[in-house]
Swiss-Prot record:
It catalyses: L-kynurenine + H2O = anthranilate + L-alanine + H(+); 3-hydroxy-L-kynurenine + H2O = 3-hydroxyanthranilate + L-alanine + H(+). NCBIfam families: kynureninase. GO terms for molecular function: kynureninase activity; pyridoxal phosphate binding. This is Kynureninase 1. Residues 303-322 are annotated as: Disordered. One of its GO terms (biological process) is L-tryptophan catabolic process to kynurenine. GO terms for cellular component: cytoplasm. Residues 303-319 have a biased composition (Low complexity). Its main location: cytoplasm. It is found in: Cytoplasm.
């Protein structure tokens, strides 16, 4: 990753901190218009105790008609306006065509459900930097990690360890430990990369590589996050992958916080496998179907086995052979079977080449439709263009956070300062005891961010729908919240009436 600096550091406070400055940034950015492709809840919507939108007008207080400031796309992305239309088309097809919706391409409809998983490959591959054959939309994140590890974690008497990041999201930790237990290995086979000191908020490349090197001779798999969920650190996927492969170690990536957030080049970086969810920056909907990547060298199906090392390391274990077919071992299901023989019911598994051969069951057409709606929004631009906007948007947020009126801010940004080492998210650690009071004020003013007990706010302006004016307005509200928390921290209720507790999911 190249070193870059925040382009807003050189601006004078009087210019940078004005509403006019923020509005000018929005006016000259062509991607600002993408906000129109999303539903932005109003402040009244957030406090309304009935489901759905609050009706604007005389019954609503004036400030409640204003749009909320939604900086929580790192937890759940906002809904694209086209999602409802797409899902209605799916429902209408099901209602009017029944089972024929599986096989027939109807005018004005969505792709037949039999092929809907193929229909999302092209755009998905652009977002993660892969060949279409290397990606598949299926299952959910942890399920996909288990499916992929069942294929790629092949412990031997010489290599049996899994290396993960010490502060990994708990589900990744559970998955790795349970895979170790599944192979009847001791929990000590799990190696965690811990910060070198308690004062270090994130991991340097040098430290990550040194831990991997230390355990290289006995390590079968490295599983790391593309972006760390708590600190927002963007790991150097290319560098770490190259290091692992040079040491004969299979490497997989959890891209939950990276997909749709930063440009990826999984194919060119020679990543072995990866998995992600589609409900954060991808805006596919809560708990929607996830995605997986398998490099083409691992997805071959044919008469010649993939190149292997003598002990089957480096992600290439001995292959399964079934009547002259050779392919990588995996947990198999009928939807991963070649389409030409999927319905012959002869019990001979012929995997689809590539990532699709890892599918188990037919995917939910409802979920796929929701993901398709999101992908069609991403198709309006490119990941490089979104990244350029995101760097400026988050850089503006950082510059404004560092300009605290009245002296030293009562918080610290624990996300890397180098824009190349982070995505959209900035994690802000408040002084002890401030969190509940600050959240109370933010929620009252229609600001949605994510909390991490005991003291951290994760603030993530999404380039698809957030604006510089959002950031400007947020800073005023946040700084006022901090001032109130410092003066009378104990008087604020823990959470305001009618507003859900700040989102706890990732």
């Amino acid at each position: 990753m190249s070193q870059t600096t925040n382009s807003y550091d050189s601006f004078q406070d009087a210019d940078l901190c004005s509403a006019a400055f923020a509005e000018k940034q929005d006016e000259k950015d062509k991607l600002t218009k993408l906000r129109e492709d999303f539903y932005i809840p109003t402040k009244g919507d957030l406090i309304n105790k009935k489901y759905g939108f609050q009706k604007s007008g005389n019954n609503a207080k004036g400030h409640e008609n204003g749009k909320c400031i939604y900086f929580c796309g790192n937890s759940l992305g906002l809904q694209p306006t086209r999602t409802k239309e797409y899902i209605n088309r799916y429902l209408d097809t099901w209602a009017s065509k029944g089972v024929f919706g599986h096989f027939t391409d109807y005018e004005g409809g969505l792709p037949p459900w039999l092929h809907i998983d193929d229909a999302v490959k092209e755009q998905t591959s652009k977002i993660v930097g892969a060949l279409p054959s290397e990606v598949v939309i299926m299952e959910t994140l942890t399920a996909n990690l288990h499916l992929l590890m069942s294929s790629f974690y092949r412990p031997t008497k010489d290599r049996w360890k899994i290396i993960i990041e010490g502060k990994a999201f708990p589900s990744d930790h559970y998955a790795a430990l349970s895979q170790i237990a599944h192979h009847d290995l001791d929990p000590s086979a799990l190696i965690t990369i811990e910060p070198p000191s308690s004062s270090a908020p994130y991991l340097s490349n040098e430290h990550i590589l040194s831990v991997i090197s230390k355990h290289a001779a006995t390590t079968a798999l490295v599983l790391l996050p593309g972006i760390q969920f708590y600190s927002g650190q963007f790991f150097d996927i290319e560098l770490i992958t190259r290091h692992c492969r040079a040491l004969g170690i299979t490497v997989g990536w959890d891209l939950a916080h990276a997909v749709g957030n930063v440009p990826l080049k999984l194919h060119d970086w020679n990543v072995d496998f990866a998995a992600w969810c589609n409900y954060k920056y991808m805006s596919g909907g809560p708990g929607v179907i996830g995605g997986a990547f398998v490099h083409e060298r691992h997805g071959t199906v044919g008469e010649t086995a993939p190149t292997t090392t003598p002990d089957g390391t480096n992600g290439n274990p001995k292959t399964i052979s079934d009547e002259s077919l050779t392919y990588r071992p995996r947990l198999s299901g009928w939807w991963g079977n070649d389409k030409s023989s999927r319905f012959t019911m002869d019990n001979k598994f012929v995997p689809i080449p590539g990532a699709s051969g890892y599918q188990l069951s037919n995917p939910s057409a409802l979920d796929m439709t929701s993901v398709m709606a999101s992908l069609d929004v991403f198709a309006l631009t490119t990941m490089d263009a979104l990244r350029e906007r995101s760097i400026r948007l988050t850089g503006y947020l950082e510059a404004r956070l560092l300009r605290y009126p009245g002296g030293e801010p009562p918080y610290t940004i624990i996300t890397p300062t180098n824009p190349a080492e982070r995505g959209a998210q900035l994690s802000v650690m408040l002084r002890p005891g401030m969190l509940d009071s600050v959240l109370h004020h933010l929620e009252k003013e229609g600001v949605v961010v994510d909390e991490r007990k005991p003291d951290v706010l994760r603030i993530a302006p999404a380039p698809l729908y957030n604006t510089f004016r959002d950031v400007h307005d947020f800073i005023g509200i946040f700084h006022e919240a901090c001032r109130k928390a410092l003066v009378k921290p104990a008087e604020a209720p823990k959470h305001s009436e009618g507003v859900p507790k700040a989102i706890q999911t990732t």
